[in-house]
Amino acid sequence: MGGIALNVVSDVVVLVHLCTRDDWRIAQQSGAHRPDSLDEIGFVHLSTPEQVHLPANRLYSGRTDLMLLRIDAARLSSPVRWEPGVPGDPGEMVFPHLYGALPVAAVISVTPYLPDADGSFPATRATHD
């Protein structure tokens, strides 16, 4: 994983994913979260808690309906690959990509992920419970 700092809680590697409240409700009913990216590019975008502000600001600036899913990586049954993000992401940063649906059983907590008054998501927002 090339120097990636992972958020570990009680020997659990924690990854995170953002989705809307409605998408989370659907996932709870079906047992898995299947975002459009799974069909479009073959994987679910994940992040570390330290990275999640980057895609949040790029894709969801100002949105107030986001949920932060904290995921126990050991509970994922599909492969996770660490791959480059998009142009503009810092240097050699790689992101975890889940090559399959995100099982609800792998999600260990769900909290609202709200922006600051200016619509941006600060870098430290997801690193604290």
Located regions from the model:
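Conserved, structured core segments of small domains
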Residues: G2-D129
